[in-house]
Amino acid sequence: TVPAGRPVLFELARGDWKASFVRLARPGYGGKAAWLMAEVRLPEAVDWPHGPAQYSVDGLPVGAGTFALSGDHEDMFFGRDSRVTVDMKQDLRQSGSKGFVGKRQTRDWKWTIEVTNSHTQPVAVRVEDPEPQIGDSAIEVKVVAKPAPVVKDHVNTWNLTVPASGKSVIDYTVEASAPEDMHFIYGR
């Protein structure tokens, strides 16, 4: 029996879930934060209703929010990891031209993305940045990055293992050119 007028909690399930923890960073949007994310994979699909949840990492509370799960996988976010920072510095932003016949205008950008880990253990960090978008076939774009990103769904993704109390660096260059008489948006 359930008493009227009082909230009651029911345990829906109990179990150990396989999860890979990664810090997700998107420095091109102006932030230096890395967000702790668990990629949860369940042995079978479930369909649980929305409800309040409290989240903890290593036994420490990191936040509260609404939880729901439908399917056999979910990406769960646990808030910002203050011990992992990402700094995207623009080293070069210039325009110019090249060629005598069929002259083209050029744009060059170069960034250094530095990921710093203050944890005493190595951490997995996923850095994401939008792939340059070409709006006209006359525009040519070349991306050079070390390490090279994985490109999927117009997103450049770098999966790094950042050493304990250490740093990892991404060198990222975009070179673009277009016909001299074309309106060419500079971008960021």
Protein language model regions, located:
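Intrinsically disordered, low-complexity Ser/Thr/Pro/Gly-rich interaction regions
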Residues: 1-112, 121-137, 147-150, 158, ...
